[in-house]
């Protein structure tokens, strides 16, 4: 049985979040949490919280054994982009894109 958790509109670039997601795809949950705990990336903390939520969902909703869970699927989709303006010299302006992500983590028993 596959159980999932989603985080939408997270303020992290999808490109950076995918680097973290690729590291834990297919790993047992214990190994994945350990990997995320020692990763220096901002996205690692965000993905760790989503993974912990998916594990809690599996335990509470499906009665799954936490020790048998693994990361079945994890993917990061692009959310809406906030457009901001940064003033420059001589009356000009540059556009700043603040990107968001939708992170989905699915865990399943072996």
UniProtKB/Swiss-Prot annotation:
Gene Ontology terms describing biological process: translation
Keywords: Ribonucleoprotein, Ribosomal protein, RNA-binding, rRNA-binding
Keyword Ribosomal protein: yes
Gene Ontology CC entries for this record: cytosolic large ribosomal subunit
Xref: InterPro entries: Ribosomal_uL22, Ribosomal_uL22_bac/chlpt-type, Ribosomal_uL22_bac/org-type, Ribosomal_uL22_CS, Ribosomal_uL22_sf
Keyword Ribonucleoprotein belongs to the record: yes
GO molecular-function terms, A-Z: rRNA binding; structural constituent of ribosome
Pfam families xref list: Ribosomal_L22 (PF00237)
Highest taxon listed in the record's lineage: Bacteria
Recorded family membership: Belongs to the universal ribosomal protein uL22 family.
Subunit structure: Part of the 50S ribosomal subunit.
HAMAP family: Ribosomal_uL22_B
Function: This protein binds specifically to 23S rRNA; its binding is stimulated by other ribosomal proteins, e.g. L4, L17, and L20. It is important during the early stages of 50S assembly. It makes multiple contacts with different domains of the 23S rRNA in the assembled 50S subunit and ribosome.
Protein name per UniProt: Large ribosomal subunit protein uL22
Lineage: Bacteria, Pseudomonadati, Pseudomonadota, Gammaproteobacteria, Chromatiales
Name of encoding gene: rplV
């Amino acid at each position: 049985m596959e159980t999932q958790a989603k985080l939408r509109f997270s303020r992290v670039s999808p490109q950076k979040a995918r680097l973290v997601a690729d590291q834990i795809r297919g790993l047992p949950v214990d190994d994945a949490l350990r990997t995320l705990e020692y990763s220096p990336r901002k996205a690692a903390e965000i993905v760790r919280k989503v993974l912990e939520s998916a594990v809690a969902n599996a335990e509470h909703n499906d009665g799954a054994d936490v020790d048998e869970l693994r990361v079945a699927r994890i993917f990061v989709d692009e959310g809406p982009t906030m457009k901001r303006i940064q003033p420059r010299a001589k009356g000009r302006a540059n556009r700043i894109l603040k990107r968001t992500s939708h992170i989905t983590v699915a865990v399943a028993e072996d």
